[in-house]
UniProtKB/Swiss-Prot annotation:
Name this protein carries in UniProt: Acetyl-coenzyme A carboxylase carboxyl transferase subunit beta, chloroplastic
Organism per entry: Anthoceros angustus (Hornwort)
Keyword Membrane set for record: no
Keyword Ligase: no
Requisite cofactors: Zn(2+)
GO annotations of cellular component type: acetyl-CoA carboxylase complex; chloroplast stroma
Upper classification of the organism: Eukaryota, Viridiplantae, Streptophyta, Embryophyta, Anthocerotophyta
Amino acid sequence: MSLMNWFEDRRKFSGLIGAFIEKATKGYILSERRKDRHIKIDTTKGLWTRCDNCENMLYIRFLRQNKRICEECGYHLQMSSTERIESLIDRGTWHPMDEDMVARDALKFSDEDSYKNRVLFYQKRTGLTDAIQTGIGKLNGIPIALGVMDFQFMGGSMGSVVGEKITRLIEYGTRESMPVIIVCSSGGARMQEGTLSLMQMAKISAVLQIHQAQKKLLYIAILTYPTTGGVTASFGMLGDVIIAEPKAYIAFAGKRVIEQTLRQKIPDGSQVAESLFDHGLLDLIVPRNLLRGVLSEIFELYSSAPCRRSNNS
């Protein structure tokens, strides 16, 4: 039996690995038929990863096919912005915007390293120019304006480039009467840009006011792990529909900061999506593998709303 056939057979009955976790961590998988026979796995090529929640070893190829959802516990691992675009947008319909926009070190900020060098490091590491990708595409045939933040680029922090790209995306969606979707994954405002970063919160909120209130167009915010700081305090919570992934960490300030400031304990789990949903701060909690279908249903409901029919007539 070939290695790939063995994986497919195991996946049908007991997830990716099931038993033999200890051996898998050493790069070996035991055959059920002949346990004295083993196949060595070359871990140097990055074939495996570990679930952040249950610590089960996961085969990366199957994990990608499953949209980075752990097959053992259902935990949603972090996705890159490119993977999210591929999971939401119809094949061959994606047209990126403002790819050449890069950050400038206006404040000449430096701590352990200069801001300029940090940006260059993450550009080489991720292949992105900054912490968001924006563009136009189709979701099940419906044209949308989509922005996807990438936590792998400086923690998804929002600086002048992220703010400007989101602003231009919303303005384009407003001109073309398109719904706007922003997938949030961020640690908040980028401290290396100071006030230039903080002002993006107000700028984005202003263009969303035009898009939503004046033009009566749809804006959907999708909150993923983690969404914190200035992103939560601005466009993350301004959606007509606010969707979160299961167990997503969503907050303005972290638990430790709140406890040190207020000098009192806050409940465990109070900053996860399920708690926020129970308190009315979210509209939906949607697993990643169901998101396309849910978004399509929302678009259908929105297009048939009375205010939309009167505006289009």
